[in-house]
Amino acid sequence: MKSFSRSANHIGIDMGSSQTRIFSENRLLLDERTVVAVDSKTNEMVGFGTDAIIRYHSNPQRIRLEWPIRNGAMVDYYYTKGILTYFLKKVLKQALARPEIVLSISSGLSSVARHALIDAVMHAGAQKAFLLPVAAAAALGQGIRLDTPDVVLSMNIGQDVTDCGMFSCGLFSEPAH
C-alpha cells in the first residue's frame, strides 16, 4: 500500500456503536455520538451526533433517533453515509482536497460489510479509503510500533464489541470467530 503523501488531507475515523472519533496528524478533530435524528413524518435526516440528541429532546413526538452502527457493524447504509458526510464536512471546513481516510473496523466484519463501509466512506467524500483492524488502530494511536519483533497484544473495548489482536514483525493475528 502506498504511503500517504504530505499534500493530501489524512483522516482516521473510529466509528463505533456509541461514539465517532475523527483524527488527523495525532489530533482529535471530532468526538460525537454515532446517532442520527430522523423526522418521523418525512423520514429525512435532520441532525447528527450531538445535534441529533438536542433535536430529539426538543421534539420527541416528531423526531426519532437511529444508530447506524450496532455491534461494530453498519446496520443502515443510508444513515451511515449521511452521518459520515456531515462529520467530514464539519472537520474539513476549508479543505480543498478530498481526504484519504483510514477507517478502523471490527475484526469480525464480513467482506460484504467491509465493501459497504468503503462505499459509504467514498460516497461521503473520501478520495481514497482504507480499512484497519480496530486493535491495530488502537495500538498505533498509542504510539506502539507493530513492525518490531516484540509481540504486542492490543485490545479495544467498545460499547458493543471488544476487539483484540496480536502483532509482531508487522504481522497481525485475528481471533477466530
Label the model's feature ranges.
Residues 1-159, 165-177:
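Nucleotide/phosphate-binding catalytic cleft detector across ATP-hydrolyzing
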